[in-house]
Amino acid sequence: MIKISAILILSFVCSITSWAQQPKLVPHPIHLKNGKQFSLNLPANFEIIPAAEGLKRVRFFAQAPDRRMFVTDMYDLTDNKKGTVYILDDWNADTGKFGKIIPYLTGLRNPNSVQFYTDAQGQDWLYLAETHQLTRQKFSRGETQPSSKAEVLATFPDYGLSYKYGGWHLTRTIAIGGNGKIYVSVGSSCNACVEKEKVRASVIEMNPDGSEQRIYATGLRNAVGLKWIGRFLFATNQGSDHLGRKKPDETFYALKQDVDYGWPACYSWQGKVLADPKFKRASGCKNIPSPYTYFPSHSSALGFDYFDDPHTDSTIKNAFLVALHGSTDEAIGHGYQIAMMRKGQKLETFMDGFLVGKKVYGRPADIYKIDEKSFYFSDDRAGVIYYVREK
């Protein structure tokens, strides 16, 4: 096995990393407080613990400046104003459980993402992405409810699910850039169409105060996973639904400024960019970049994190773990797992068992690396946050 110096870590992430083989997965019994019992399959040298239960459509994580974990909850699949941002508090590393789940913000419209930023003056800010807007508010360390009023930094198309052009994709995702910028992904209004608003199917960039807003990247049908790692802004992207069960790929990109990633006229299949015959594009698809990597069609790639610590177990070292939420149609059966991805290598499975036959036990949504030996992931079907650690 080729080993990579820790000094190179993320600056080297776009080149070949250590070669690995599909790890053997073994059943790990899961017993939830609501009485449900099943098994999730993962490597034998890891254990999995339900760290928080009783949530609804729990989604994306962020760690506050005071080290507490925050997580969003969209409540259900409807366009609603019942969403919540929770504080996951009183963490016990021995038991792998949170002692308290505290509602921090309530009555929110489909909150998918929350992030924190500390400005040059040392002021902490909480950023919240709802369907219709991006807001920020001052954050005081240790607080259990907001201490200041939110200010609106940006507004987004908010036609909901009844929009005449389709009404798709209610989520917005925030990433804090290592360059001091704020990024927000806005999904398309449709399965495949020519959009009426430029902000749709894009990632936008702005200053922390909301000024100098611009389109950063386009042609991204729904970039739900968005995270700045090292020197790169990475994104997962969901492909169109009308090209059959085997096409197109779900894709993963290291985004570049002012690049068009092709949707709706171009799509990826087995990593190659092809033209969608439904749409005519004067320039064709020859200048559309191929993805960093790709996932099975309709597997719904969402949140992810990168495991680069020199002391990380070799199973996941120098790999991305990606939550494949799963196809809406369970009969397709793609996704429903945590995938393990290294550039230039075959996709591997770190965890599965969320779908057994026609029975759905969960749908992973986001992954958050805690340290070199452990991570959290959210399950928005069961309303559970899991803790996974090396034994």
Model-inferred region functions:
Residues V26-K33, I49-T78, S299-Y306, V322:
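Beta-strand-rich domains and repeat architectures in extracellular enzymes and scaffolds
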Residues A51-G54, P103-R109, A154-D158, S162-G166, ...:
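Surface loop/turn motifs at the tips and blade-to-blade linkers of beta-strand repeat domains
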Residues A52, A62, Q115, A175, ...:
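Conserved beta-strand position repeated across blades of beta-propeller domains
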Residues L105-P111, Q115-Y117, E130-I176:
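Asp-box/WD-like beta-propeller blade repeats and closely related beta-sheet repeat scaffolds
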Residues L88-G96, Q137-Q145, K256-Y261, M340-G344, ...:
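Short loop/turn segments immediately following beta-strands, especially the blade-tip
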Residues R68-T72, G122-L128, K181-S185, F232-T236, ...:
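Conserved beta-propeller blade signature
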Residues Q21-A44, T171, S188-N191, A201, ...:
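Beta-propeller domain segments
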Residues K81-D119:
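Blade-loop segments of beta-propeller domains
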